[in-house]
Amino acid sequence: MCGIVGYIGNNEKKQIILNGLKELEYRGYDSAGMAVMQEGELSFFKAVGKLENLANKCTDFESQGYGFAIGHTRWATHGKPTEINAHPHLGQYSCVIHNGIIENYKEIKDKLEKEGVSFLSQTDTEVIVQLFEFYARNLGVFEAWQKTIKELRGAFATLLVTKKDPNHVYFAKNAAPLIIGKNANKEWYFSSGDAPLIGSCDEVMYLEDLSLGYASKDELVVYENDILKSLCFSKLSGDKAYAKKDGFRFFMEKEIYEQSRVMSEVLMGRIQGDEVVFDELNNEDLSQVDEITLCACGTSYHAAMASAYLFERIAKVKAKVEIASEFRYREAIIKKDSLFIVISQSGETADTLEALKIAKEQGAKTFAICNVDNSNIVRLAHLSLLTRAGIEKGVASTKAFATQVLTLWMLAIFMAQKRNLNVSAEIKALLHTPNCVSVKQALHEKIHRLSKRYLDGHGFFFIGRDVFYPLALEGALKLKELSYLHAEGYPAGEMKHGPIALADSKLYTIALMPKHMLYEKTKSNVEELIARDSTVLSISPLEFDLSDDFIKTNEQDHYMCEFFEMMVITQLLAMEISIRLGNDVDMPRNLAKSVTVE
């Protein structure tokens, strides 16, 4: 997840770009860069790390007078966070910035390399500028740009400047946000979000998917699906905090709604035909792995628990799960050459990092599932996969959990493929998951209405079976973190072994009742709680009249699609209860986003 800005006008361009990137820094911050076109000359600057590093690099650079500039702040998805991989990416006479993922970048890169084109970076973005210059050998600039964009598959919002046409900025947008702003001074602005435009623009146009065009001092031309579009601008809101949240009340709410797009990005470039592919694992033989240990803390531990079921069921590999803070002190025995997978959103979780070191010392092959490239955990592990969740501002994890489970599910399928096991049903379900987490307004409104029943009482049970047990644990954790109400997750089959003693009308039970995973067994457990007067909210695609409240989910073909749909419901429920209680959903008390100490 990255942020892009652009500017056409007479003011100091460097500072406008830096100011704009500052407003987008929450989208990504492992590197940043900018390019300025003035009087036909192209200047560019890049820096790794925080935005201030870029500002320091261009301290003496001045850019008054007419021209244009583009800038980018990056959160790595393809390629390490290095200066070479930072945007803008350069051709011989052009440069480009890009937010998104080019799904077919390897295919394009291979084609261009056969034509003698050389690449400097490891990124997917560089193919855009190299492909453009390849076509511009024989075509006009706009025709070359059109042909380039038509060849790209995936999500992208991109800006290009070229010395071949020093009077225009070229842009394109598909499945990633791009906004064009204007003001009375005939200046044009481009941005991934509203925040950089507030105070500089009066009106904005939100580009639709499959849009491309060009802009200069005197004109803006936009095509949508190859049809010339009439320009339609709307008034820009003046609230920057609101803009950063894209109109949502809280970052957590925004991040719940982002999960569909983010999960699409997790899949991009990693499914080819009917197979899961990981470029990062091309040279690795995981077919001989006969034991997996998954180790994590908190929400990541719940993702590990869910994936243990998947590794055993899909890949037929023995899997066990460890809490990192316990593992590091109990003198655990790790089988040499087994696979030791650590999971961490930040890549800096102290207990998980120490557990990784112990496993490595004992001879295990170590594997990191992480959201932050170049973090300590990623650098230390033998292998790694990035979850591509982007920045998560809400302290209570939502999209990071979703992408961890999805990435681990894909890894289980990948390992099953290496063992020549049939995974066709898994691939079909994988491709459907982004739809499963898309939030419908009617659902959110219903959860908001139901939430008022669940504001008091002496506690909550979240219950489920199989992968829905770790989801119950995660649902209970979300509610605890945000509402400060007591909540516990249990395997539904364990109710009779003690917890049912708490059941009465002020014990609230959230029952996860999927059609495709032990429905009748779970239903029987829920009926036992109802018989003892527990107030029950059941979540299922199958009608269940005995519960006090019922949320009907969609009929799915695979239990993991049910898993992700129910995940969203538990997230929204925890958030709505907490909002009714007057709590700060983004910054719950006593908690930090990344736990880097014991």
Curated annotation (Swiss-Prot):
UniProt GO BP: carbohydrate metabolic process; fructose 6-phosphate metabolic process; protein N-linked glycosylation; UDP-N-acetylglucosamine metabolic process
Domain of life: Bacteria
Active-site residues annotated for this sequence: 2 (nucleophile), 593 (for fru-6p isomerization activity)
Reactions listed under catalytic activity: D-fructose 6-phosphate + L-glutamine = D-glucosamine 6-phosphate + L-glutamate
Main location: cytoplasm
Cellular localisation: Cytoplasm
A Pfam family reported for this protein in Swiss-Prot or TrEMBL: SIS
Enzyme class: transferase
Entry-linked InterPro entries: GATase_2_dom, GFAT, GFAT_N, GlmS/AgaS_SIS, GlmS/FrlB_SIS, Ntn_hydrolases_N, SIS_dom, SIS_dom_sf
Entry GO terms, CC: cytosol
One MF annotation (Gene Ontology) recorded for this entry: glutamine-fructose-6-phosphate transaminase (isomerizing) activity
PANTHER family, A to Z: GLUCOSAMINE--FRUCTOSE-6-PHOSPHATE AMINOTRANSFERASE, ISOMERIZING, GLUTAMINE--FRUCTOSE-6-PHOSPHATE TRANSAMINASE (ISOMERIZING)
Role: Catalyzes the first step in hexosamine metabolism, converting fructose-6P into glucosamine-6P using glutamine as a nitrogen source.
The protein's name: Glutamine--fructose-6-phosphate aminotransferase [isomerizing]
Source organism (scientific name): Campylobacter jejuni subsp. jejuni serotype O:2 (strain ATCC 700819 / NCTC 11168)
